[in-house]
Amino acid sequence: MRVDENLRLDEQLLLFMEQLEALEEKRQRLNSLIEEGWFSIAKARYSMGNKQVSALQYASEMQPLAHVETSLLEGGTAEFKCERSENKAEEQKTKTIEDIGAKETGLRRRVHTKQKEVKEGEQDTDEVKTKTDSPTPEHRNPLKWFGILVPQNLKQAQSAFKEVITLSVEIASLQSTILATRKEMQVQMKEKQERTEKAQLEVKEE
């Protein structure tokens, strides 16, 4: 019984140490990316000019390109996920194209089956083309605030800070997992200590 308890505690401790090591690696990577991003912005300012890369170029209306979704798992552990708007826009675009393709297939069948519905089919086709041609609202790339042709340094800065967002979410999830692991380990150690003290009292009484 005690062997199983000790083994379980050892496994829990090893897991805890592995999680701490992973957290340290992610934090180092995060700091490195932040430094890289700011250094790239500094180089872009040097080549374009300070006034060309500043808050003055920000759009009057902004929309976030990334959202953080949180969920509570079993045991009280919080999980964080990063959802990017460009991914959702791409999925929506693909779904729209599939829906339009299905409608066009249905129209062709109706035209071949019933000659009387040719005019109605043409009207439906025109509506489908109108929906296809109409521009869908998309999130504007923030790089375009600073011009059409921006230096590579500015693109590198954007890429670095995008990864910073993703990595920050991973770190938050890992920190929550570490807290849960530590709490579980503390509970096991407390139970073991109580059993040990109880056993010692029984020995003294004998």
Swiss-Prot record:
**Which species?**
Danio rerio
Tell me the function of this protein. Answer: Accessory component of the proton-transporting vacuolar (V)-ATPase protein pump involved in intracellular iron homeostasis. May be involved in Golgi homeostasis.
Protein name per UniProt: Vacuolar ATPase assembly protein VMA22
GO molecular-function term, one example from the UniProt record:
unfolded protein binding
Coiled-coil positions: 4-37, 178-206
Q: Where does it sit, as one GO cellular component term?
A: endoplasmic reticulum-Golgi intermediate compartment
Q: Could you tell me where the Basic and acidic residues compositional bias lies? A: 114-140
Q: How does it assemble?
A: Accessory component of the multisubunit proton-transporting vacuolar (V)-ATPase protein pump.
- Keyword terms: Coiled coil, Cytoplasmic vesicle, Endoplasmic reticulum, Endosome, Lysosome
Name the segments for region: Disordered: 109-140
Question: Where does this polypeptide localize?
Answer: Endosome; Lysosome; Endoplasmic reticulum-Golgi intermediate compartment; Cytoplasmic vesicle, COPI-coated vesicle
Which GO terms of type biological process are on file? intracellular iron ion homeostasis; vacuolar proton-transporting V-type ATPase complex assembly
